[in-house]
Amino acid sequence: MELWSELQSYQNLRRLLELASARTSSCWRILFGSTLTNVIYRAKEEYSSRFADLLSHNPGIFASLNLGHHSFFQEIVIRNLDFSSPGRTVSGLAFICFILDQWSAQTHLSQGYTLDYMAMALWRTLLRRKRVLGCLPAQRPHGLDPVQEEEEEEENLRAGLDPSTEL
């Protein structure tokens, strides 16, 4: 089981969070989940009291998530997760699953939205950290090749300027 290969795809990460959350039955988790799913679920159950204690220090997290103020969640939770080793990665995923369970239990938002938001926030953080560590190459934004851009600039010297005023 290669941990990082399972976390590279958004769909895999979303499915992993869904199967490790409380919304999935034990039977379904055993039949259709991976070993990683079961490990994350067990870690979430074992450390639930510690996770609850961590969340009690920041009581406004769920209120801000319900109101759509996601920057508070990003600052308090996501930026403090550590993915430097497989054990820390599993505990970070278990903590996100715990937050997902707590948020789903007390929100008016759909379960699909809460799952999608948590998966996307976590996936973007994983990609950003892998790029910083040099594991993943930075990709150029979609557009023209640099050579084509230079050729177009040479052909049309007034590109981007105000149109000429002719009488």
From Swiss-Prot:
Q: Where is this region: Disordered?
A: 143-167
Q: Name one GO cellular component term.
A: host cell plasma membrane
Q: Which keywords does this chain's UniProt record carry?
A: Apoptosis, Early protein, Host cell membrane, Host membrane, Host nucleus, Host-virus interaction, Inhibition of host apoptosis by viral BCL2-like protein, Membrane, Modulation of host cell apoptosis by virus
Q: What is its main location?
A: host cell
Pfam families membership: Adeno_E1B_19K
GO BP: any one term: symbiont-mediated suppression of host apoptosis
Compartments where found:
Host cell membrane; Host nucleus envelope; Host nucleus lamina
Report the PROSITE patterns cross-referenced here.
Answer: BCL2_FAMILY
Specify whether Membrane is a keyword of the entry: yes
User: Which InterPro entries does the entry mention?
Assistant: Adenovir_t-Ag_E1B_19kDa, Bcl2-like
Similarity comment: Belongs to the adenoviridae E1B 19 kDa protein family.
Q: What does this protein do?
A: Putative adenovirus Bcl-2 homolog that inhibits apoptosis induced by TNF or FAS pathways, as well as p53-mediated apoptosis. Without E1B 19K function, virus production is compromised because of premature death of host cell. Interacts with Bax protein in cell lysates.
Q: Name it.
A: E1B protein, small T-antigen
